[in-house]
Amino acid sequence: MNGDNIIQALGLEAHPEGGFYRETWRCQDRAAAPRLGDRCFGTSIYFLLRAGDVSRFHRLASDEIWHFHQGDPITVAMLTQEDGLKLHLVGGMDGGIARPQLVIPKNTWFGAVIEGPSAFGYTLVGCTVSPGFDFRDFELARPEEIWSVVSHRPVDQTTQQWIQRLT
């Protein structure tokens, strides 16, 4: 099965950041979240990225957890003023350094891409957000915003390349 077959089988739709998604769960319980207002407790989606596509830098007002399901390992780039660029490999445990789960703290700029040769042509992950995802809390990065995150420090070539790739 290839990525396009999975997109069709799971009923995935194009996501504004890149890739494809479908919400699979939205908690019916709600609460007032600090600074966010009324939100459900949690949400979950399927997210598929095909080889050659990118999930562009974006951030959420809630924590997000990525759970690897199948396909190629995927590199998630996280960018903060405090830590600069950090790269995380999410995938199956059979290849060594990849981990099957990654927590992305709220308000962290992040994006993702399949690097190197692709054995499957896609990555399928689940993303759980708490408090629950709401497009009002989703911010797609403009290049000047991302560059401002690292403007207070020397920017190495790797960071430059990732910023250019994911904006």
Language model region names:
Residues 123-126:
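Short, well-structured beta-strand segments enriched in hydrophobic/aromatic residues
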Residues 128-135:
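Short edge-strand/loop segments of extracellular domains
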Residues 1-102, 111-112, 118-120, 131, ...:
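Non-catalytic, conserved peripheral segments adjacent to functional cores
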Residues 105:
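Histidine-centered phosphotransfer motif of kinases
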